[in-house]
UniProtKB/Swiss-Prot annotation:
Species assigned in the record: Arabidopsis thaliana (Mouse-ear cress)
Lineage of origin: Eukaryota, Viridiplantae, Streptophyta, Embryophyta, Tracheophyta
InterPro entries: Csc1-like (IPR045122), CSC1/OSCA1-like_7TM (IPR003864), CSC1/OSCA1-like_cyt (IPR027815), Csc1/OSCA1-like_N (IPR032880)
Listed GO CC annotations: membrane
Record's keyword annotation contains Ribosomal protein: no
Protein name in the entry: Hyperosmolality-gated Ca2+ permeable channel 2.3
Gene name per UniProt: OSCA2.3
GO molecular function: calcium-activated cation channel activity; mechanosensitive monoatomic ion channel activity
């Protein structure tokens, strides 16, 4: 790709970013858009009503939202938004620090060295130069200047590992501080017990109570046995829809038609009162629900949520084998009540096993299927390939502006459009695997997305057109470093364009929230929107973290190969830091907490990125006829993996569970609290299946 084509892509995306930011700064001030750009604040403070008086300032773009987004401290984010939100922000902070250092070294040291090479001698003006002139490919084979890249790799690895260690330690400190500062939470005192043995003459509930009163008498508080409630939930969903419809009719938020004709197609029969009609249907559904609830007593599942009086008691029950038979009385930490994925208990073990096999096959098929759009995208990036495929377009493709747009902007845009449907698919696949909580489903989807992006967004793009037809390259591990060293630098221009298209424009479209804005406009146009019923969107950690980490992988691997990508990445992370602070404060609301457990994923992926950079460096120094540097690079991935193992042993156990020291100290602090009895009363029913709680919604509506 020529530098002019890259500049065209950057110019288009800069224009889109400026347009989106301008529109956002105006639209966010309009009272009618408060549920689009501030739903979290509306739900939290109930401030959905704003003055409708005309104000000229509302029509002028301003940047005051940036200042407000940067005002909250880390401690304020931790206390108001939760630990997961803080970890999400710290991923941006970590990336900004890494690529600030990388940009200084890459732009002021490595880039001039690359540019002064003579491997690609081109006597053109700067805009007509190829991107290869700014990459390590332009450095002459065997040149001593390559030792500068060698030293940069070692220094960069040390800096990344140091920052990673510091961030690990910081987040762990905040995780402990969050435990000490927060109020007692049900999941801290509760354990999920599965594999409850069947005892003749006893129900599941009686068996659980007898066991824990016998062996955990000092700390056992209560338990709730899980029931099969899938059929009841169907009735609940129908009742909820009917209740909302009845509420809208009575409030006048939809058509105030209070009567309709009964009979066939509403043309015959008596005039029926709509409110009375819906109320009777709702009453009948509630009667059916109560009947179904009364029949659920015999549909117990051999699992229960067991609550304890102390966190320490719950931790002991979680980490110690309960019965002689290791397949019975299985215990694990309970998720938050709102985090429980209740369909997990409906499926049998065999059904979950089959689902896992189906998910694995579907995931592999998706990886293979997405090679097709990758090949298409790489064909667009290559004018010669396009002319081969479509010879009748040769005249159009030779036009300067057309060729620059097609090679510089279209490939990354089309690839981004293909990727839009991937996150929902990964969430769907993960939900079929039998996870007990929504947070586990999101973590699984996050890992799947990372694998997908590594394969389809990186390796498939890098190898397509050069080594994709040689699938056996992966069966010969010795050739992998050389193949990657030859293929990766050639795709630098595509990934720079991808960063500005998917990164810059993607972030600006995130803050504009175009789809929710259009949906809000359409519902208001047809009079169907009700401010009381809108839903605050959940924080998209599982979708955004893979994208952030993938850009990190690009920056790390191209640090010494093509450092021109580094400032574009730094701009992306700075924009992301500002935009997502704004979105977390105003738009998103976490429905449940994972306790910062996304951070170990960030750590592992960063280590993988470093090792991949080292493997490419080994092959590249070999190709560049510098065998000594290639050999001296080999210890680097080994040292990096050893560092990762140390970090996992040092920090990972504290992410899986809290240490006894912290739990006992927190339990002692709770003993001095006056409202623990009230908390215990709430804890007893905290894990009651929502389907077993009788709906009283219709009773609360006055005629």
């Amino acid at each position: 790709m020529l530098l002019s084509a890259l500049l065209t892509s950057v110019g288009i995306n800069l224009g889109l970013c400026f347009l989106f930011f301008t529109l956002y700064s105006i639209l966010r001030k309009q009272p009618s858009n408060v549920t689009v750009y501030g739903p979290r604040l509306v739900k939290k403070d109930g401030k959905s009503q704003q003055s409708n008086e005309f104000n000229l300032e509302r029509l002028l773009p301003t940047a005051g939202w940036v200042k407000r987004a940067l005002e909250p401290t880390n401690d304020e984010i931790l206390s108001n938004l939760g630990l997961d939100a803080l970890v999400f922000i710290r991923v941006f902070v970590f990336s900004i620090r890494v690529f600030s250092f990388a940009s200084v070294v890459g732009i002021f040291i490595l880039l001039p060295v690359n540019y002064m090479g003579t491997e690609f001698e081109e006597f053109f003006d700067l805009p007509k130069k190829s991107m290869d002139n700014f990459s390590i490919s332009n450095v002459n084979d065997g040149s001593n200047k390559l030792w500068i890249h060698f030293c940069a790799i070692y220094i960069f690895t040390a800096v990344v590992c140091s920052l990673l260690y510091y961030e690990h330690k910081y987040i762990l400190t905040k995780r402990i501080a969050h435990l000490y500062s927060s109020k007692p939470q049900p999941q801290e005192f509760t354990v999920l017990v599965s594999g409850v043995p069947l005892v003749s003459g006893n129900s599941i509930s009686e068996t659980v109570e007898n066991f824990f009163r016998e062996y955990h008498s000092s700390s056992y508080l209560s338990h709730i046995v899980v029931h099969r409630t899938d059929k009841l939930k169907v009735l609940m969903n129908d009742a909820e829809k009917l209740y909302k419809k009845l509420t809208r009719v009575k409030s006048g938020s939809i058509s105030r038609q209070k009567s309709r004709w009964g009979g066939f197609l509403g043309m015959f029969g008596n005039n029926v009162d709509v409110v009375d009609h819906y109320q009777k249907k709702l009453d009948k559904l509630e009667d059916d629900m109560r009947l179904k609830q009364s029949l659920l007593a015999g549909e117990e599942v051999p699992a229960a949520f067991v609550s304890f009086r102390t966190r320490h008691g719950a931790a002991i029950a979680t980490n110690i084998q309960q019965g002689i038979d290791p397949t019975q009385w299985l215990t694990e930490a309970a998720p938050e009540p709102e985090d429980v994925h209740w369909p997990f208990f409906t499926a049998s073990f065999v059904r979950r096993w089959i689902s896992n096999v189906v998910v694995l096959v579907a995931f592999v098929a998706l990886l293979i299927l997405y090679i097709v759009p990758v090949v298409l995208v790489q064909g667009l990036a290559n004018l010669h390939q396009l002319e081969t495929w479509f010879p009748f377009l040769k005249g159009i493709l030779n036009m300067k502006i057309v060729s620059q747009v097609i090679t510089g902007y279209l490939p990354s845009l089309i690839f981004q459009l293909f990727l839009l449907i991937v996150p929902p698919i990964m969430l769907l696949l993960s939900s079929m695997q039998g996870f007990i909580s929504h947070s586990q489903i999101e973590k699984s989807a996050c890992i799947k997305l990372l694998i997908f992006t590594v394969w389809n967004s990186f390796f498939a793009n890098v190898l397509s057109g050069s080594a994709l037809y040689r699938v056996n390259v992966f069966l010969e591990p010795k050739t992998i470093p050389r193949v990657l060293a030859a293929a990766v630098p050639a795709q630098a221009s595509f990934f720079v364009s991808y960063v500005v298209t998917s990164g810059w424009t993607g972030l600006s479209s995130e803050i504009l929230r175009l789809v929710p804005l259009l949906w809000s406009f359409i519902t208001k146009l047809f009079g169907k929107e009700d401010d009381k019923e809108f839903e605050v969107p959940s924080t998209p950690f599982c979708q955004e973290i893979p994208r952030i980490l993938f850009f990190g992988l690009l920056g790390i691997t191209y640090f010494f190969l093509s450092p021109l990508i580094l400032p574009f990445l730094l701009v992306y992370y700075c924009l992301g830091y500002i935009i997502y602070r704004n979105q977390l404060l105003n738009v998103y609301a976490a429905k449940y907490e994972t306790g910062g457990k996304f951070w170990p994923i960030v750590h592992s992926y960063t280590i993988f990125s470093l090792v991949l950079m080292h493997i490419i460096a080994v092959g590249l120094f070999g190709l560049k006829e510098l065998p000594v540097a290639s050999s001296l690079t080999i210890p680097l991935p080994v040292l990096t993996v050893l560092f990762s193992i140390y970090c996992q042993r040092r920090f990972l156990p504290n992410f899986k569970s809290y240490p006894t020291q912290c739990l006992v100290n927190k339990d002692k602090a709770d003993e001095r609290e006056q409202n623990m009895s009230e908390f215990y009363s709430e804890l007893v029913v905290a894990y009651r299946d929502p389907a077993l709680s009788a709906s009283q919604d219709s009773r609360d509506i006055s005629p």
